[in-house]
UniProtKB/Swiss-Prot annotation:
Principal location class: membrane
Enzyme class: translocase
Subcellular location: Cell inner membrane
Name listed for the protein in its UniProt record: Ion-translocating oxidoreductase complex subunit A
Known function: Part of a membrane-bound complex that couples electron transfer with translocation of ions across the membrane.
A GO biological-process term: electron transport chain
Subunit annotation: The complex is composed of six subunits: RnfA, RnfB, RnfC, RnfD, RnfE and RnfG.
Organism (species): Aromatoleum aromaticum (strain DSM 19018 / LMG 30748 / EbN1)
GO cellular component, one term: plasma membrane
Name of encoding gene: rnfA
Length: 193
C-alpha cells in the first residue's frame, strides 16, 4: 500500500508531467485563463490519461510485445488515445454542454496532447504491471490537473493586477509557470528515487 501511495505522490508532485517533463504545456497555457475551463480540461484529461494508460498497457502486453510489433507502438497508442478522447467528448457534450462549449477546440486537441502520449510511452518504459500503470497514469493526470488549476488561479489573479505592458499576456504567463516550476522543484527531495 505504501508503494502505491509513493507512486501516486511522486508522479503527481515530484515528477510532474508539465513542470518536470515539460509535456502538455500547450493546453496548460491555452486553457488556464479561467478556473472553470481549467477544471473541466483537467478532469477530461485525467479521464483520458487514465483510460489511455490502461488501454496502452493492455495493447502493449497482449498484442505489440507478444507479436514483436513494437514499431507500431506510437501509432497504435495514438489510435487508442483518439478513441478515448472521442468517448470523453461525447460524454461531456451529453452531460455538460456548457463545459463542452467552454473547452472549445481544446477538447479534441487532447488527442494531440503530448502529455497523454508521453504517459503511455513512459508506462511502457517503466515496465510497471497493470495496476501500477493505471496508478501512474492517474497520478500523472492528477499532477497535470493540479498544475492547470494552480496556474489558472494565478493567471486570474494576474489579470486583476496592474502588469507592465511589456509583460502583459504571454510573457507574464511564462514567468508565472516558471516560478511554479521552481516551487514544484522544491518537492524533489520529498520522494527518494
Amino acid at each position: 500500500m505504501h508503494e502505491y501511495a509513493l507512486l501516486l505522490l511522486s508522479t503527481a508532485l515530484v515528477n510532474n508531467v508539465v513542470l518536470v517533463k515539460f509535456l502538455g504545456l500547450c493546453p496548460a497555457m491555452g486553457v488556464s485563463k479561467s478556473m472553470d475551463a481549467a477544471l473541466g480540461m483537467g478532469l477530461a484529461t485525467t479521464f483520458v490519461i487514465t483510460l489511455a494508460a490502461a488501454a496502452s498497457w493492455m495493447l502493449e502486453h497482449w498484442l505489440l510485445a507478444p507479436f514483436d510489433l513494437g514499431f507500431l507502438r506510437i501509432l497504435s497508442f495514438i489510435l487508442v488515445i483518439a478513441a478515448a478522447v472521442q468517448f470523453t467528448e461525447m460524454a461531456i457534450r451529453k452531460m455538460s454542454p456548457a463545459l463542452y462549449q467552454s473547452l472549445g477546440i481544446y477538447l479534441p486537441l487532447i488527442t494531440t496532447n503530448c502529455a497523454v502520449l508521453g504517459v503511455a510511452l513512459l508506462n511502457v518504459q517503466q515496465g510497471y504491471g497493470f495496476f501500477k500503470s493505471v496508478l501512474f497514469g492517474f497520478g500523472s493526470a492528477l499532477g497535470f490537473t493540479l498544475v492547470l488549476l494552480i496556474f489558472a488561479g494565478l493567471r486570474e489573479r494576474l489579470a486583476l493586477a496592474s502588469v507592465p505592458a511589456a509583460f502583459a499576456g504571454a510573457p507574464a504567463a511564462f514567468i508565472t509557470i516558471s516560478l511554479l516550476s521552481l516551487a514544484f522543484m522544491g518537492l524533489s527531495g520529498l520522494v527518494a528515487t
